[in-house]
Amino acid sequence: MSKLSLALTNTTLGIPVTRLISPWLLDLGGFHGLTLFEMGLAMVAFGFVFALPLTTPPRVKWIGPLDIVSYLLIAIGFGAIAVALSLGRIYWWFEAPWLGMLFALAVICLTLAVIVELHRDSPLIDIRWLTSPATLHFAGAILLMRIVLAEQTVGASNFFQALGIQNEQTMPLYAVILCAILAGGLTCALLLRPGRENWFYGTALACVALGAWLDSGATSLTRPHDIRLSQALVAYGSGLFLPAAMAQGMGGVITRGPIFILSFITVFLFTQSIGGLLGSALFGSFITLRTAFHFNVLAERSEERRVG
């Protein structure tokens, strides 16, 4: 359990680490230097994959021709949703017709994938298990939690971007966030045991709620050092949430057999990736609307003063 907690914690460190090192890389070589560094990290990771191979698991001939069809339909559906959610607030939802086409394509592809899987004797993904009340409850809970956690990655960064605060000024804040995530992961590694997942969910949600409440009083005078405590609480909650969710889900799947592992991975990846993008789209769109509203109010007041 401790190894799983630490491994999942490492997957959440990307954003704070990026915020810490990207200002220096941008100063050295601009976006070219930043992307070059990313390519270097990918090559190093690629080398480690071959230098430190995992133990080969037992292999069973399982993949069939229809599995490829189902996989392609699911991949296209998820990909279309991801692209639309990522670019919706940039091109704006009602201004770009192709965003609606992407959502329609996603619905068609995922519907076809469900139809194919329901009529197979050995499905790639067990749709009936995915639509069971227990699975829907689990998926809905972690999806909502993932949407809430997007407040930190989008809300705080876009807020300071709207205020004109540079990346260098937010580096101490993201250092605090990084330490809080690590603290959450270490807490899970030390205390998380089967049957304790709900306590971790409750603690994570309480931390996020308290942090969001503290941030609700932010104004145009708020600076990064003013929200270190609140963002640390949100980060600590995110560090508690992911290992507990994976531990609870995997524990139930392993008892049912290895056939359900792929179905669980599909649910987990969907809720985490699509949930994160959905949260970013919701918070980003809200910030865009409120920013435009306040700009219009300021423009009207300026015009009234000029006329008066």
Model-derived features with residue positions:
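Helix-loop-helix hairpins in multi-pass membrane proteins, especially solute transporters
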Residues: 1-69
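Alpha-helical transmembrane segments of multi-pass secondary-active solute transporters
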Residues: 3, 34-37, 101, 170, ...
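Cytoplasmic-side transmembrane-helix entry/capping segments in multi-pass membrane proteins
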Residues: 3-9, 63-72, 128-131, 198-205
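Structural signature of transmembrane alpha-helices in multi-pass secondary transporters
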Residues: 4-15, 70, 74, 145, ...
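Alpha-helical transmembrane segments
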Residues: 32-42, 97-107, 227-236
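Membrane-helix boundary/linker segments in multi-pass transporters
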Residues: 50-63, 83-170
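12-transmembrane solute porter fold
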Residues: 123-293
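Conserved small/polar residues in nucleotide/adenosyl-binding loops
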Residues: 305-307
